[in-house]
């Protein structure tokens, strides 16, 4: 008999709960998906045009491992302008294959076996499995709806042990749309410094905040040297398929992460890097137009959920809304499956984002207003039917 070819680590990890409903809806005619967190806009034309031009010019070879110098310079300028933090493009910035690679490389570079990583939930599905694959121990901090799923200093303090090394800060948050203001972040930063922790700040939705600007924890006093900032072009610039992100932080950490990136990836896609330079230099207006459209959809959904009397707070980040369905006495997966089967609309059960997401749904508004209105009509009908059956 052949030995088991698979590691215990990988067989113990469940596939993403997000993709399950996306795969199901793709097989249903007339179905609407509000499940995938991907912009419905085309990549801005100037970015695409630059990509075409660089291909025509034959710029199809490897770049340096850490990325094109001009791109890192533009990223440095962008971050100084947006989050008011200066990063040395030569030593403190590494270009990655999407923000997801940055998360993976950061955890693998910083964790020894048994190191604990604090992960507020509900949050993006990759943090826990990537921590496990890096031989770390994920420790979940359940966030509370009553305070808009924000992390508090008291919750953080209670979760810290002598083995704690890192805190993940997933804000603006997927799936809740929650943001952290400067006033929210300051007590968190004090706890982090007092316990000598590092922060992995996933800021991929930083371009998508409404009514208030994004604040990075790295901008607070004493935090740049203990924070790794993850960002990229997928969400704000509508470049999901270009697979381009970056990670910024102390040079002593970036230099070691570069080894993993070197051996596993070599470099991020050359064509995408040239295109992103154009995006950072010239596409701020297009990014603002997309943000305005998301904001219009956000306001529409908040109002519609209020009319349906589905409890949810008003989100000010990303492109998700996170209504409660606890009144119906079923799990979020049961609700989502019935909604899909009966009304042909896909949403993601909150449980896909951790146990504290149970009883909620993630509804993406990265879809046209026409699709949202049709989906809301079907949801209203479904909710009325459930309430009549009580």
Predicted region positions:
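PLP-dependent class I/II
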Residues: 3-6, 11-14, 24-28, 32, ...
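Intrinsically disordered, tyrosine-centered linear signaling motifs in cytosolic regions
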Residues: 61-62, 205
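Conserved N-terminal alpha-helix of the aminotransferase class I/II PLP-enzyme fold
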Residues: 62-97
């Amino acid at each position: 008999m052949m030995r088991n070819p698979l590691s215990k680590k990988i067989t113990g990890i469940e596939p993403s709960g997000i993709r399950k409903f996306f795969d199901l809806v793709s097989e249903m005619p007339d179905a609407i998906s509000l499940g995938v967190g991907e912009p419905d806009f085309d990549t801005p034309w100037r970015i695409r045009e630059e990509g075409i031009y660089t291909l025509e010019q034959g710029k199809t070879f490897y770049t340096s491992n850490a990325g094109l110098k001009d791109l890192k310079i533009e990223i440095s300028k962008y971050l100084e302008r947006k989050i008011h933090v200066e990063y040395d493009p030569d030593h403190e910035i590494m270009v990655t294959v999407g923000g997801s690679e940055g998360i993976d490389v950061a955890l693998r570079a910083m964790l020894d076996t048994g190191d604990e990583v604090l992960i507020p939930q509900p949050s993006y599905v990759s943090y826990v499995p990537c921590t496990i694959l890096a031989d770390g121990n994920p420790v979940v901090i359940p966030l509370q709806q009553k305070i808009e799923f924000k992390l508090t200093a008291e919750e953080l303090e209670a979760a810290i042990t002598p083995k704690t090394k890192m805190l993940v800060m997933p804000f603006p948050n997927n799936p809740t749309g929650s943001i952290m203001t400067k006033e929210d972040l300051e007590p968190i930063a004090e706890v982090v410094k007092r316990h000598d922790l590092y922060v992995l700040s996933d800021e991929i939705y930083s371009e998508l905040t409404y009514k208030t600007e994004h604040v990075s924890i790295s901008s607070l006093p004493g935090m740049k040297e203990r924070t790794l900032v993850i960002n990229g072009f997928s969400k704000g610039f509508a470049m999901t398929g270009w697979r381009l992100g970056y990670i910024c932080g102390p040079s002593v950490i970036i230099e070691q992460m570069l080894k993993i990136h070197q051996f596993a990836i070599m470099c991020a896609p050359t064509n995408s890097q040239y295109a992103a330079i154009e995006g950072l230099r010239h596409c701020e207006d297009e990014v603002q137009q997309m943000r305005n459209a998301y904001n219009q959809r956000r306001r529409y959904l908040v109002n519609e959920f209020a009319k349906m009397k589905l409890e949810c707070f008003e989100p000010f980040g990303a492109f998700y809304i996170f209504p409660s369905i606890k009144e119906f006495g079923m799990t979020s997966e049961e609700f989502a499956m019935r909604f899909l089967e009966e009304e042909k609309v896909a949403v993601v059960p909150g449980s896909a984002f951790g146990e504290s997401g149970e009883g909620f749904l993630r509804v993406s508004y990265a879809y046209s207003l026409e699709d949202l209105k049709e989906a809301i009509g079907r949801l209203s009908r479904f909710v009325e039917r459930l309430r009549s059956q009580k």
